[in-house]
Amino acid sequence: MIYNYYPGCTLSTKAKQLDMAARRCAEVLGFPLVELPEWQCCGAVYPMAPDAIAERLSAVRALVAARENGGVLVTLCSACYHVIKRVNHDMATNTEIRQKVNNYLQLEEPYAGETRVLHYLEVLRDEIGWEKLAQLVSHPLKERRVGAYYGCLLLRPGAVLALDDVESPTVMEAFIKALGAEPVIYSMRNECCGGYLALKDKAQCEKLVSDIKNNAASCGAQELVTACPLCAYNLTANGAAG
């Protein structure tokens, strides 16, 4: 299977180390990532208006490129995953959006949602398996208590993304456990960190982040791990240490 890879803007800039680590780990685990030869920003925010056709074009172009090379598209950024998978769902289920996008792009073969969109964590869980991952860990994170921070883009809306249970997810805890650490469950792991609110209302964003960190710390977490580089930035740059 060919795992076409969409890195996205953040993993190509601010979170380049995460991108490099993900590529290397994928090679070791046997699913080398093949970066799309050309890609554009996904838009970062899913367009809610059904007539927002231009905002969907870059995601569809990436989906079409993946369709032509095996039909699987993997991304690591929760925001990119959220946007691209929801746009893919639009193309598969919404006739009006599909017709308008295809009319604009003038594709030789119209696109109708054929590409499978996977988050990197889904590949680890469903294609590789936690047992194999655990066996290949060379430096287990022993005696580390780690809280998973899901945020709001990785899981919702559950009916479309279908990555894990929206209220009681387990994928990141299983990942943490496979790395040798002890996963810590805390109530705010699915709450929004503020996202782009940091640009408009930094004080409110700092409060949200502080609440999340303090909640995790009160449950025994020594550190947090997240699948979203944007969340990682917010959690690092804003709020009290917890």
Where are each of the predicted segments found?
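Iron-sulfur cluster-binding electron-transfer modules in prokaryotic oxidoreductases
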Residues: M1-G242
